[in-house]
């Protein structure tokens, strides 16, 4: 009988019982919501990137295009290679300008090479300096009269 008992134990050890499981449908709303919530940080990062980098760069580009398009004969300019000169010839049909860098020394440069119109910058600087001096004079004269 002991041999039959061992055989029945061996049969019990060799068998694996599989239990039935229920198939539960996955809720589609939860997966859709989790997909949208993971998309929100990416949208925020793009928005920050746009407002901190792309938008200011676009503004600077437009200002530069306006500056280059308004160059006139007789203005003092600075090129991106560091050359100061006075514009002697501007052509609307060509992208070039002629700049006099010394007496009877003229070079051709691209309009896009203009970094600054220094004669305009000087005018603005002089106006700011004058307004500061006027304010100081008013303060000094006001202090002396009292």
From Swiss-Prot:
Pfam families: YajC (PF02699). The chain crosses the membrane at residues 34-54. Keywords: Cell inner membrane, Cell membrane, Membrane, Protein transport, Translocation, Transmembrane, Transmembrane helix, Transport. Residues 125-146 are annotated as: Disordered. One of its GO terms (biological process) is protein transport. It is found in: Cell inner membrane. The keyword Protein biosynthesis does not apply. Its main location: membrane. It comes from the Bacteria. Residues 125-134 have a biased composition (Basic and acidic residues). It is a single-pass membrane protein. One of its GO terms (cellular component) is plasma membrane. Part of the SecDF-YidC-YajC translocase complex. The SecDF-YidC-YajC translocase forms a supercomplex with SecYEG, called the holo-translocon (HTL). NCBIfam families: yajC. Belongs to the YajC family. The SecYEG-SecDF-YajC-YidC holo-translocon (HTL) protein secretase/insertase is a supercomplex required for protein secretion, insertion of proteins into membranes, and assembly of membrane protein complexes. While the SecYEG complex is essential for assembly of a number of proteins and complexes, the SecDF-YajC-YidC subcomplex facilitates these functions. This is Sec translocon accessory complex subunit YajC. It comes from Rickettsia bellii (strain RML369-C). The lineage of its organism: Bacteria, Pseudomonadati, Pseudomonadota, Alphaproteobacteria, Rickettsiales.
């Amino acid at each position: 009988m002991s041999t039959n008992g061992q055989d029945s134990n061996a049969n019990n050890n060799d068998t694996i019982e599989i239990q039935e499981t229920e198939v539960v449908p996955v809720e589609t709303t939860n997966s859709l919501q989790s997909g949208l919530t993971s998309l929100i940080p990416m949208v925020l990062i793009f928005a920050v990137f746009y407002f901190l980098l792309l938008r200011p760069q676009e503004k600077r580009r437009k200002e530069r295009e306006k500056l280059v398009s308004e160059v006139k004969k007789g203005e003092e300019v600075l090129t991106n290679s560091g050359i100061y000169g006075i514009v002697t010839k501007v052509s609307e049909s060509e992208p070039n300008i002629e700049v006099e860098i010394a007496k009877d020394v003229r070079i051709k440069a691209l309009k896009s090479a203009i970094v600054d119109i220094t004669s305009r910058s000087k005018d603005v600087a002089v106006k700011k300096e004058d307004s500061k001096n006027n304010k100081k004079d008013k303060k000094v004269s006001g202090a002396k009269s009292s």
